[in-house]
A protein has these predicted regions:
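Surface-exposed, interaction-prone regions used to assemble/regulate multi-protein complexes
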Residues: 1-142
Length: 142
C-alpha cells in the first residue's frame, strides 16, 4: 500500500482548532482517512469491542461514521504526514489492547492512539509523531 493522501474528517469546531495549530498533534472526534495510490482507502477511528464493552483504535476499508464529515481536511503536506506520502506504509498495533496503531514507512511513523493530554480517553483519536507516555492503562471494559 503506497500512501497517496491523508485526510482528517472533522467536525467544524475541530477544523477551527486545526487552523490555529496546523502541524500539531491532533485529537479527532471523527476519523482519519488514508488514501492509497491504487484507489483503496483505510479509515482509522474509535470502535467499541464486539461485546460493546471495550474500546480500541480500529482500521478498516470502510468509514466508521454515518454521513459526510462537516470538514474534510487534506493534511498530506503536514510535517507529520509528508515523510509517509509516496511511500509503502504498514499499519501495526503497538503493545496490547489495540490502543496504539503505528503507521510506518521509510523510517518515519505516525501514531493513532487512545492517550492524549495526560489521560486515557475515548471518543477521540489522538494523532501524533510519537507513541503515548502514560501513567496508567485504561480499565478493561471501559
Amino acid at each position: 500500500m503506497v500512501l497517496a493522501r491523508v485526510y482528517y474528517e472533522l467536525f467544524s469546531h475541530e477544523a477551527e482548532w486545526l487552523d490555529a495549530h496546523s502541524g500539531a498533534d491532533a485529537e479527532l472526534g471523527r476519523q482519519l482517512r488514508l488514501e492509497m495510490t491504487d484507489g483503496s482507502r483505510v479509515f482509522i477511528a474509535w470502535a467499541w469491542g464486539a461485546d460493546g464493552d471495550g474500546y480500541h483504535v480500529e482500521f478498516a476499508p470502510h468509514s466508521f461514521c454515518a454521513g459526510a464529515p462537516e470538514v474534510d481536511r487534506d493534511v498530506s503536506a503536514w510535517p507529520l504526514w509528508s515523510p509517509l506520502v509516496g511511500q509503502p506504509v504498514t499499519l501495526s498495533y503497538v503493545g496490547e489492547g489495540q490502543q496504539v496503531l503505528a503507521i510506518r514507512a521509510a523510517g518515519a511513523a505516525a501514531y493513532c492512539c487512545s492517550f492524549g493530554r495526560g489521560v486515557w480517553g475515548m471518543d477521540e483519536l489522538r494523532v501524533g509523531d510519537r507513541p503515548p507516555q502514560h501513567d496508567r492503562e485504561p480499565a478493561r471494559g471501559t
